[in-house]
Structure formats: C-alpha cells, structure tokens
Amino acid sequence: VTLSVTTDGKAPALSAAICDALVPALADCEMLCTCICTLRNTWKKTIPEQRRRAQLLRQITASDALALFREQGQTAYLQYAAKLSGIVPQEKTAILTVSFGTAYAETREQTIGAVERAIGKAFPEADVYRAFTSSRIVCRMRQNGTQVDTVNEALERLKQLGYTQIFCQPTYVAAGKEYEQLCTDAAKWKRSFLHLSVGVPLLMHTADYPHLIQTMAESGIIAHEAHRAYLLMGHGTAHAGTLAYPVFEDWLRHCGYDNVFVGTLGGVPTLEMALAQLKKHAYTEVVLSPMLLAAGKHVQRDMAGEHPASWKSILEQNGYSVTVQTQGLGAYPAIQERYVAHLRELMASQNFPETK
C-alpha cells in the first residue's frame, strides 16, 4: 500500500498531520494483507474445492473478521481463520545471521561460517541466511565476485521467498552502533512478516559475562598464570555499547583472572590503558588474542602486524615477549554454542523445534 498526500504547498503541516494519522493504519493494512496472502496460499495447497476457498476468503475479509484483527491483532485473527478452515497455516521460517563481516574468505568460513553451521545444526527446520552490516566489506566482496546481502537486502529477499517467520541473530561481541542499526532496520520490516525478532550479541545480559569467561578459559584463550599476562583486543566504538569491555574486565577480576586484560581499537579501555595496567605487575610475557568474531584486517594488521604501530610491536617496544593468537572467537566451538544459546532463548517463545 502506498500513500501520497499533498496540499500543493498550501498547508504542509496538514499533509504531515494526515500522514501521521494514516501511516499506522496503512501499516496494519500491510500486515493484514500478509496474513490473508499466507492463508490463501495455504488453502490453495490443502483445500481442492475452489468454492470452499472463496467462501473462506469472504469470511476472513468480512467486517467482523477485520474488526477482530484491528482490536486483537494477528494472532487472534489467524486463530479465527484456523477455526473456520480447520487448517493451521504452515509457517516458513528463516534465521538471518547478521555480522559485521570480513573480506578474508578463509577466515570468513572458519568463523562466521562456523557459527552459521552450528546454528543450522541446532535448528534444522529453519533455513539459515547471511547478512553483513559493513558496507565497505559488502562492496569489496562484490567487486571480488562474492555476493552477500545487507540486512535490508536480505529481509527483502526473505519476503520475496515467502518466509513468514524471521529470527535475526547478530554475531557481534557487544551491542554497539552496528547492533543499534540492525534493530532499527529490522523494526522497519516487522509488518512484512508474521513474526520478526532480533537476538542479542555475545555480551548483553549479566549472565553473559561469566559464561563467556568460562568459555574462553575452556577454549584455551585465557588461563590463570603467575608470570604470563593475556591481552584481549576488542573492537570498541564511541557507542555506549563499548562499556561492555570494561565491564568484562571487571568480571575477569571477579572470576580471579588478575592476569587477563582488555583493550579496544576504538573505545575503552584503550591499548594505553591496558599497558598501564600491565606495568603495575612483573609480567615479562604477554599472549595477545583477538576478542573479535573473525580474525580479519584488524587482527592481521592492527594486532599482529610487523609495522611499529601494531599492538604486537608496541608491546615488544615496552619490553614484553609476545605470543600472538590470531584465531577469531567464531572459530571456537564453545563460542559458537554461546550464539546458539542466545538464539535458542529468542526462539523459545515461538516453540520452535531444535536438535540438541
């Protein structure tokens, strides 16, 4: 449904007021149309008699049925239609994994691809699709002949393919600006599907912090050692979501990991702050690891590069013997399962089947 309102410049405030009043109604109309199309397509496959299908269509578009939709919403409306026909519409479900992305093909499949495969194994009844949020990476991949969708492109594709239930699972570490944009984009598409919801990144709720610390320890990313420190490099942004990193470091101390420190490329703690903490102790060795899903450009260049401005070089300039781990978080099966756990929580309210 499209709408155009104009007063030819005579009363633009009136045009705006009319639009403000009509847009919610049009949004409801779009959702109603989606419901009707879903029911009609289901009945075409399950009810051979055309006359019976036409009768049902008249019933679900009658004034009392439309009033039910307006007053009680789509769930009550679909239940009413199911009672009339005796048939529950078949939902078509997709999981959309949303990542910042990386242009490094091998790394991409070892990390992002590995998370997606773990999700597909846990939820075999759903189809798994991919979207990247970095426009620079999307552009570069397309130039190299690899197609990947943005979030809006992916949701448009899923709509055209007839999916009715969408679960978006981000693979971010923290809820920064990319996650905020994902939520904004997804909100625009809610009326295009019967159900659309967005999961949470690795660090979102209080329980996520000790869980991730335990998972990293079990995966060998960090360890209690008296003479060796561990420095984790996160991305970080100027967004409030970057507060997850100092909170994570606080949890490290609470869990007894006094030798594990966190720094970020674009937020807090900075590398300088992490160095200041390191110098308070007598460590001579530092294990440098990415606190990033994928070991892309930031790991290869900013963290482990041989140039003097890399984290590895700066640590060596400060007298530390540095061991570099370049494997992104997504390559560890236990980390993959943390994303699966978040998605499981998101899908639980829909009673969606899974394989344990």
Q: Which sequence ranges carry the predicted segments?
A:
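Active-site-proximal alpha-helix that buttresses catalytic centers in soluble enzyme cores
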Residues: L84-K356
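Rossmann-fold NAD(P)-binding glycine/threonine-rich loop
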Residues: V1-V5
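An accessory alpha-helical subdomain
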Residues: T7-A82
